[in-house]
Amino acid sequence: MTEPTRAQAATPTTEGLAVDENKIIAERREKLQALRQQGVAFPNDFQPTHQAGALHAQYGETDQATLEASPVEVSIAGRMMLKRVMGKASFATVQDGSGQIQFYITRDKVGEDVYAAFKHWDLGDIISARGELFRTNKGELSVQVRELRLLSKALRPLPDKFHGLADQETKYRQRYVDLIVSPETRSTFRARTQAISSIRRHMADAGFMEVETPMLHPIPGGAAAKPFITHHNALDMQMFMRIAPELYLKRLIVGGFERVFEINRNFRNEGVSPRHNPEFTMMEFYAAYTDYRWLMDFTENLIRQAAIDARGSATVTYQGRELDLSKPFHRLTICGAIQKYAPEYTDAQLADADFLRAELKNKFKINTSAPQFLNAGLGTLQLVLFEETAEAQLWEPTYIVDYPVEVSPLARGSDTQPGITERFELFITGREIANGFSELNDPEDQAERFRKQVEQKDAGDEEAMYFDADYIRALEYGMPPTGGCGIGIDRLVMLLTDSPNIRDVILFPHLRRED
């Protein structure tokens, strides 16, 4: 059987190409059947001694004379990405988890039977080799193969090497193929792992204990969001996938664990957008005897170090614009940000709830009769105007501080500004990256705020919070002054990897069903 041509291996985009792919798959199934009959279809007795990346790192500058004088024996395996058959000698480019390396395969070295079989192996097959390192006449570090085996037969052809997966949705839906053919995708997810590892080190060095709290909650809480609902059969009770771990983490502060953090999934039954995925990763941390000012300094340093560890520099480029994370982050109030980016608004207008309600309705076409606006006060209206006029302009790292109490039901109130809380949100490239505040530890104040949230929910606001009586009971045992913050890991990784869509940094994002 002949080797599939590059055109045959392309991603099918027409009926004709689909037929070609089906033909290729049928041919490969015939090859697999022959391997089964020989009893060698999927061997599992090969142990590699090296990876491609490590070989290039260690021997990338070693010349041929040195390799001949001190032979380097290697056993290596990977996916065959390129293949050139030339009479009695052939080349194959093999890719493992660390990179690519070239195999040099000759009939004299591997034997006539193996060499004949190799000619019928396909791109995408997993193969292994034992041999010695050498340099080709062109100077490329390669493996002079002595033993060659087929470990796993690929039945489906890879996309064309020059075009890869052209359709973005296919990249998300078939991430396994995207990872095979796209070095950029592999780099993105390695950077994600490095960023999370950096965060864990940073937290451990600061004395934080990593914990795990429930994913199934009897009462959803810790954020203003619509939950996913499920049913616990054994307990015969309705449960909610967690929207945030906040209230459980603060219970641990009450219990005496004074510095805790968790990196885990949250679930919110809401829309999908370039910034939102219903299942996403958050890091939340809480520290006793701190406040929101301490949190801002700590978060700034943590993000800066994550950039250095994941990308090698505190300076990153996002969508063609450079960001220097080594500089101090800006700080603005909500009204200060509005007047910076929409200077036409006066102090008097920003203090006039009737004006703001009319402005949001008439200029920004917002339905101010919606349930979440029924009892909206000045603070809520200011926040919505900020979101419409300023949020997208916050490209440089900027803390927006001093949020209204009515939109911050879990945050401690300011000692000097009535109606304001000690809360911040961090924006970078116009996106919220973090949200933190000095925690409200007054159980009576917290209970009253929960009651107001219940009123909002009863009025039709699906994102308003429930009343959590057990959390109030925990606060009644006494919680020390505490600061807490949540950081969106996915959005942070978007920033560090120059990814425009949150689905670019989630291995298997949610998509509509295939027809």
UniProtKB/Swiss-Prot annotation:
Any single biological process term in GO: lysyl-tRNA aminoacylation
InterPro entries, alphabetized: Aa-tRNA-synt_II, aa-tRNA-synth_II, aa-tRNA-synth_II/BPL/LPL, Lys-tRNA-ligase_II, Lys-tRNA-ligase_II_N, Lys-tRNA-synth_II_C, NA-bd_OB-fold, NA-bd_OB_tRNA
Essential cofactor(s): Mg(2+)
Statement: the UniProt record of this protein carries the keyword Protein biosynthesis: yes
Keywords: Aminoacyl-tRNA synthetase, ATP-binding, Cytoplasm, Ligase, Magnesium, Metal-binding, Nucleotide-binding, Protein biosynthesis
Cofactor note: Binds 3 Mg(2+) ions per subunit.
First-tier enzyme category under EC: ligase
Substrates-to-products reaction catalysed: tRNA(Lys) + L-lysine + ATP = L-lysyl-tRNA(Lys) + AMP + diphosphate
Positions annotated to bind Mg(2+) 2: E432
Cellular component GO terms, alphabetical: cytosol
Xref: SUPFAM superfamilies: Class II aaRS and biotin synthetases (SSF55681), Nucleic acid-binding proteins (SSF50249)
Gene Ontology MF terms: ATP binding; lysine-tRNA ligase activity; magnesium ion binding; tRNA binding
The enzyme's E.C. designation: 6.1.1.6
Pfam families listed in its UniProt record: tRNA-synt_2, tRNA_anti-codon
Subcellular location: Cytoplasm
The keyword Cytoplasm belongs to this UniProt entry's keyword annotation: yes
HAMAP family, per database record: Lys_tRNA_synth_class2
Protein name: Lysine--tRNA ligase
Organism: Cupriavidus metallidurans (strain ATCC 43123 / DSM 2839 / NBRC 102507 / CH34)
